[in-house]
Amino acid sequence: MLRCRSSINILQLHSRFHTHEIIISSKESEARTRITDEERLVIKRFPIFKNDSSYILPSSNKLTKVKKEHIALKIHKIKKLFGEDPNNVGYLNYHLPKSYPVPFEINNRAYDNSDGNGENEKVRNRLSVTKLLTKRWCELREAYDIYSETPLFEHKQIIEGKLVHQKLEEDIHPVTEDLESFVEDFEVPIPTDNFHNHVDDLFSCSMRLLSLFRCGEAREVRCHAFLDSRTGTFIDGLPKDGKDVLVSGIIDHLSLRRKIRVFTSSGFTEFNGLNDEVFENGNNFQSIIEWLNANIDFLKSEYQINVSDVKTRMFRSVVSQKSVLKYSKYQVMYYRYFLELLGLHPDVTYGQLLNSSLSRGFNIDQRIDPAKVIYFMASDEVIVDDMRKLRDGDDIGFPPFDSDFTGSSPTEEEYDMSILSDQITDPNVLERYGEFLVPWKRPVTLKYFAARLAQMYNCISPLLSKHLTLEYYYKGDNFKNINFDFNEDEIRNGAFDSSMFWFGKRDIEPIEPTSENLITYCKYCDYVNVCSWRQKATQQKKELGPRLLKLNQN
């Protein structure tokens, strides 16, 4: 496999875009979900630990102590909020609490402790793509989990899935030896605070979109859209107010492919990107973007970008539940749709990226630490020419960004890279970057990285294929792919239905109480033995036989 030059950020190996955290051992996993001593005292008073048969845990003989405590705490919290079903004593009510905030506010309020300086990575006014899939399993289970406000329990399958994702990512975006050596030997501390890590995410996403053309693949690519909570529809412009909610996700796999495979006497030729063509006029953003825009008609006729999602399995088989498969497809459709929206108008996307950064609590005008700028140039020389332009006060060729400096007076605080001159003595570093260790006419801010990322989204959007893929992996082996087509109407309807739930415009819609569903969906649910919806359905089925028999006798 061709290993792409777009590398993983060596300074953030512990966190891929703040989502794919790698847990090495089950002990560490338990530590993340370990319950406090105070909570443990509360739990010991629960009926679940007093031999109350109505609170028996699902498959309790197979659960660890930590998992049992985790479930018990959730049930305790939900019972306090939802109360018991008045028509089914001992079981949980399955209607949204009328006197309590709607699901979105519950999901959102956990993020209200940001200090305004970006020191909290949680995002206000946001949903993830997976949060739109409320009916993937059972919406009632989803609602209980939301209102319990309890962190996700990371079981073995989640941990192994993250490891598979990391391995796939490193295969395409390895940490280069040159960058490892640079970071190890660099004499100036490279900042890794939340703000600089966020900027790193923007830079890394641009590099991954470039890697589509360098080597034909990219993994772990960020995308987003804004959902109007009033109408349940996605907008294609800038958010107007707090009612437009950020929905974000990370795409597992993008691949650039020929529309028609090339066959020679030795068989089909392997496609490894368009590195020679795209970079023939120089390895810098402006020339690359200009080439892609100038050749877009040719590219559309010959190539397409496929969007895929990776699903890891504990067995060599795909999911059997129809709703799980349906909403897994929706997930990929959302990703593809978001990329399409992001590519429509680069100036709008630029504004959205800035808005997204603001929602994370970051100052979009904050200057990037000079050591981080050197690190970015060492990571990929594609930005070196842009850094020269900013240093010299020249435009980079993207008007929405360049206009910030048009007719402006010198900034109150000079952006001075010369402060590193006395700290850097390595002759190799001075030879490569000495020209930048001077006062700059324009500062490097988050806005620059948002600008180039917006342009890259615009370059790939026209190439998006209607054909999408679910990739199934077992122990690192891609044993099955499911191909399907993009359907915009389906995800528009799905987003509308999900938003009605999140913003409290409809009640919870539990899974259909068929015999098959009660077995395949409910068996391993944390709430299986306190769920009134399930208990009523089960009881009705038990009574159905005698009722039919009685009718027959009459």
From Swiss-Prot:
Gene Ontology CC annotation, any one: mitochondrion
Main location: mitochondrion
Residues involved in [4Fe-4S] cluster binding: C138, C522, C525, C531
Cofactor annotation remark: Binds 1 [4Fe-4S] cluster.
Highest taxon of the lineage: Eukaryota
E.C. number(s) listed in UniProt: 3.1.-.-
The protein's name: Exonuclease V, mitochondrial
Provenance organism: Vanderwaltozyma polyspora (strain ATCC 22028 / DSM 70294 / BCRC 21397 / CBS 2163 / NBRC 10782 / NRRL Y-8283 / UCD 57-17)
Lineage of the organism: Eukaryota, Fungi, Dikarya, Ascomycota, Saccharomycotina
Gene: EXO5
